[in-house]
Structures are given as C-alpha cells and as structure tokens.
C-alpha cells in the first residue's frame, strides 16, 4: 500500500471512529449535554453534572416551574414541596456540586432573562468564600454554554461529543442494574432537582452511640486550616443577583444554611464573622449557619450536609409555620443593622442537652394472654397484671404512638417515664383479658391486628381452627375508651406455611425471591391499603403505624410504607429507643422487648431502665 493510501485509510479510520464516538455520546448523553432525548434519564445525567443536566431538563420542563432554589450541594435539603405550599409556587432546586457563587450569578441571570421567575431562594454557604469562578473539571463542573458567556458553542459540544466513551458505556450498563431506589449513579430526583434521599431518610436513627457506629466521621472529625479568600467576589455576585431580581420584580430570599459545628473550627473566627458581616451589608438574610442544630451530629448526613428534616425547620422558620418543632435559636433574620456582637458570637453555638431534645422510650411486645401458657408468646393474665402493676408503681405512664409523633414533630412534652405497651396479631384475649387490666391501671396500649384474621377463629379460606381474634365491635369499644389504638400488622403478609396451598408464601413483609421490585411495591401497597381501610372502618381512627411481622423488613419496605403515610414502624429487636425531636427517623424500626411469662415484674423494670 502506498503512503498516500495508508494516510487516507488512517484518516478515514480516524473519522469513522470519531463519528462512532460522537454518535455513542450523542445517543447515551451521560451528562445530559444534548437534552438526553433518547433515554431521558436526567437523574443519571445530573449525578454526572448537575449544572448541565438540570439546564437541559429545564429547557424541556421550565413551564412546570416558576420559582427556583440556588446554591451548593447542601442546598438540596431546602424542601421544594414545603416552599411550594408556603409560597403558592412551583419550585425547582438547582443545587450543584461545589460552592461557586459566580455560577449562581450566571444561572440566575439566564433564568430571569429566559423563564418566568416569581421567587428565587439563594443559599449562601460558608464555602462560597472558599472557591469562586472555578471550573475544576470541563465535563462535570461546568455550566451549559447558554448560561456561561465564557464558554463557546464549539468548545462545549466538542468536549461532550468526544468525551471518554466509558461515560456513555457506564450509563448504558447502569440501565441494566437500575432499581426503584436511588443508587450511586442516579442520586437526584429529577422532578424536584434535590438529592433523592429516600434511602437515607428511611434509615432508623437512635442513640448517639448507634449513630457513631453508622457515621464514624463524627467520632474523629477531620480538621484542616481553611480561609475565605473570595469573600469579596462572592458578595459581588450576591449583589448582582439581588440587582437582577429587583429589576425583574423577582422575590429574592437569601439564607445561610446550617454548618456543622466542627467544620466551623476549620476557620478563624474573624474570617467567619467578616463573611456573614459582608453578606448583611449586601442583603438581609436568614441565618441558620450556627445554632444548637449545628452541635447535634444526628441532624447531619455527614460532616457538611444537613438532613432534609432540618430543611423542613428552615422552611418553617422562614415562612412562619408553627406546626413544627424548631429550636429557639435556629434562624435569625440578619440585616445591615444587626449588632456587631452577633457576628462575633457566630462561632459559639450552645448545644441543647440530651434531655432537651430527646427522651428514652422502652416498648414492650406481647402477643396472647392465656391461663394455659404453652409457648413463649403467651403470658398469663396474673403475670401480665403483675407486670403492669409494677410499671404503674414505678411511675411509668403508658403512651400512644400519636404522643410519640407529637413529641418528635412538634416538641410536645411526654411524661417523665414513658412506656409503650404493644400486642401483635390481634388475639381476642387482648380484649377479654388484657383490656380490663389496662383499664384498671389506666395504661394505654397499641394492638397490631392482622387484617385477614380480624374477627375470626379460622385460618383464611380453610377450616383450620386458629386462636380467636377480636373483630370490629371489640376494636370500636377499645378505641372509644381512649386507652387503646388499633394499628396494622399487615393485612395478609404474616402467613402460616402449613396452612397455605400456594407456592409463594408470605411469612413476612419481605419481597419474595421470585418477585420484581415493581410487583412487590404493588403487593405491599395493596396489602397496607386494605389493612388501613379495614381498621379505620372499624375504629374511625387513623392507621399510620405498622409492626413488621417477625420484625423483618427492607429499605424498600420502609420507603414504600412512608410513601403510603406510615409514620411509625416497629421491629422485634430488643432495646430502649432514643426518640429525638425533629428526627422522625427515630420512629422507624423501633426496638421492642419481647415479654414472656418468665419475665418477673422486677426483671421487667430492670430490663427497661
């Protein structure tokens, strides 16, 4: 082959390979740079580059929104739905990786000039003074060229058309392993723009010791010396955003999100004071940066990102809601006239004591009462009364799950020594034997009834006799007393294999091995919906608590039940619960002590202390 032909073949080969690479990147579009027209998987694209992918998403959906939230990654916890309700608006959260106020300015300008914008919420985080106008990665940290006048059209398209093919191939491979819940490759909720925290927000939270086991970063927090060299430039961009909003008639609200107390120690006090002092000279703002919330690690996902529950507190404080517990020192409206002492004290948040934000709640688990005790799930009426009497004489007060929710969500007080008494399955003995004893001592209790066994003494669709279960009339009488609540133990996800004829037996609430996620979610939804309708129809009381059969569950179980309005779930693991104000996760998979005939009154008291 002549040299000319060799060169020609080489050039043609290069062009063909380049065309194939461009076609692959255009079709897969792993950054959403071209609008992701084929796969339309923006939660994946936004994980690679939220700046570019969210722009592409809004180009197709901006008519669904009229308000926006801007800021670094911690801004994700600013709750879109809560602000929608408070403002009567449709917010989209434009959080991005990194804290770059220059990018916020460019995005705000594009939004105001091209979309309908009624409200803009800007989160100014401390790190906005640490970096500025920094494109650390041309694929993952840059803006769309339409938002960034410093990026040419040619530069933008060539970098994405000829990007490393491994990005596109990774997206195609992820399609095969995608699940209902978020994974590391699709961490965003494309509808809201926020991080998809369904998994993190479903995890049970309890004592500080348990939290440190799950999040060791808080046990040995990494410190480093940091400065804020770009405070002036940051404030110039904030001022530019303010001017843009004023000229366009956009309602601008500025907030400074919570910073974990240990992270604040990375900076010199005067450096931080100057940052917030400078912000106050530019615009009034809601300051949440340093408070008792900053001192409580359980309010943070990690060392820099506060939980969505804290975001709800932010929204409530900013909009004047009073139906949510908020620490008194959380959220100050700061202006140019705020006294100098305020900025000097920003590094001195006072932690709330454990007694101020949490309480210890033991939960007891019973099943069946009988004069003839033949197994570990039975307790005699005499022993049960002795146990209840011991609780009463020791100063314990039976509380309901409604009271626990009121404590966590609204900060309503609990008795000094609360205890929760529960019964699983809904046996008739709960009505004939336990209920009179509970009445005698004024002790509240919750009974978790199996729907398919409600009011029957035979196993479903068979002639097999079972221990009798109470029905609607008894349930109505007990709940009318104010002492008893009837809640769900599922409708038919606590099956007994010897009495089942099908091949797939649901002994518990877990997904069957042969079942897809979608089929499982549908089955669980139908089961709980049926259980709730049955029990609410019998008692007229809301059903929003579920005890897991055999204590077994998965993250998908918990997430699905939360979406159905279940606010409390219970396991069968032993231990005393640490219930924390502002953290509904402390009501998930709650611990319970299984109480048997062998537990003496003295042993019971020792167990729960």
Question: Model-found features: residue ranges?
Answer:
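Membrane/wall-proximal cationic-aromatic binding patches
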Residues: 30-93, 100-110, 397, 402-409
């Amino acid at each position: 082959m002549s040299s000319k032909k060799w060169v020609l073949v080489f050039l043609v080969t290069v062009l063909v390979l380049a065309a194939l690479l461009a076609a692959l990147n255009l079709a897969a579009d792993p950054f959403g740079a071209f609008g992701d027209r084929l796969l339309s998987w923006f939660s994946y694209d936004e994980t690679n580059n939220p700046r570019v992918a969210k722009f592409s998403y809004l180009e197709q959906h901006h008519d669904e929104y009229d308000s926006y939230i801007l800021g670094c990654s911690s801004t994700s916890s600013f709750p879109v739905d809560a602000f929608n309700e408070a403002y009567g608006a449709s917010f989209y959260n434009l959080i991005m990786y990194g804290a770059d106020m220059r990018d916020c300015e460019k995005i705000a300008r594009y939004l105001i000039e091209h979309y309908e914008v009624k409200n803009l919420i800007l989160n100014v985080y401390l790190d906005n003074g640490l970096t500025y106008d920094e494109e650390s990665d041309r694929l993952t940290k840059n803006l769309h060229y339409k938002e960034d006048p410093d990026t040419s059209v040619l530069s933008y398209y060539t970098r994405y058309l000829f990007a490393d093919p491994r990005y596109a191939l990774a997206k195609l491979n992820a399609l095969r392993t995608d699940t209902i819940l978020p994974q590391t490759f699709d961490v965003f909720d494309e509808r809201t723009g926020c991080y998809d925290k369904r998994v993190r927000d479903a995890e049970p939270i309890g004592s500080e010791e348990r939290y440190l086991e799950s999040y060791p970063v808080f046990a040995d927090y990494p410190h480093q010396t940091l400065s804020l060299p770009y405070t002036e430039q940051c404030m110039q961009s904030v001022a530019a955003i303010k001017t843009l909003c004023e000229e366009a008639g956009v309602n601008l609200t500025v907030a400074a999100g919570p910073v974990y107390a240990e992270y604040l120690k990375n900076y010199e006090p005067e450096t931080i004071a100057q940052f917030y002092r400078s912000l106050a000279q530019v615009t009034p703002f809601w300051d949440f940066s340093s408070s008792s919330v900053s001192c409580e690690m359980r309010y943070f996902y990690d060392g820099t990102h506060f939980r969505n529950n804290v975001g709800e507190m932010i929204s409530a404080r900013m909009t004047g809601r009073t139906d949510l517990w908020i620490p008194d020192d959380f959220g100050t409206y700061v202006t140019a006239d705020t006294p100098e002492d305020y900025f000097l004290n920003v590094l001195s948040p006072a932690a709330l004591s454990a007694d101020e934000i949490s309480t210890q709640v033991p939960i007891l688990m019973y099943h069946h009462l009988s004069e003839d005790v033949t197994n570990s799930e039975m307790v005699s009426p005499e022993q049960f009364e002795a146990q209840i009497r011991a609780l009463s004489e020791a100063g314990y007060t039976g509380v309901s799950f409604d009271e626990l929710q009121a404590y966590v969500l609204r900060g309503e007080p609990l008795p000094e020594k609360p205890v929760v008494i529960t019964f699983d399955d809904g046996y008739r003995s709960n009505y004939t034997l336990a209920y009179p004893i509970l009445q005698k001592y004024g002790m509240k209790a919750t009974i978790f009834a199996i729907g398919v066994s409600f009011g029957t003494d035979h196993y479903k669709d068979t002639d097999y006799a079972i221990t009798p279960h109470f029905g609607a009339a008894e349930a109505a009488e007990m709940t009318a007393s104010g002492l008893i609540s009837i809640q769900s133990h599922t409708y038919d996800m606590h099956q007994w294999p010897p009495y089942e004829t099908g091949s797939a037996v649901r002994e518990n609430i877990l997904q069957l091995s042969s079942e897809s996620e979608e089929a499982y979610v549908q089955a669980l939804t139908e089961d709980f919906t049926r259980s709730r309708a049955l029990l609410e129809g019998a008692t007229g009381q809301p059903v929003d608590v579920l005890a897991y059969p055999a204590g077994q569950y998965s993250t998908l179980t918990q997430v699905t039940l939360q979406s159905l309005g279940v606010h409390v779930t219970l396991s069968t693991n032993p231990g005393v619960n640490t219930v924390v104000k502002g953290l509904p996760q402390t009501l998930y998979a709650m611990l319970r002590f299984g109480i048997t005939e062998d537990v003496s009154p003295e042993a019971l008291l020792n167990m729960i202390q």
